[in-house]
Curated annotation (Swiss-Prot):
The lineage of its organism: Eukaryota, Metazoa, Chordata, Craniata, Vertebrata. Keywords: Amidation, Amphibian defense peptide, Cytolysis, Hemolysis, Immunity, Innate immunity, Secreted. This is Temporin-1Te. GO terms for biological process: innate immune response; killing of cells of another organism. Belongs to the frog skin active peptide (FSAP) family. Temporin subfamily.
Amino acid sequence: VLPIIGNLLNSLL
């Protein structure tokens, strides 16, 4: 899983 994907998910939360 790319770190950018995690950042996007965190932004939604």
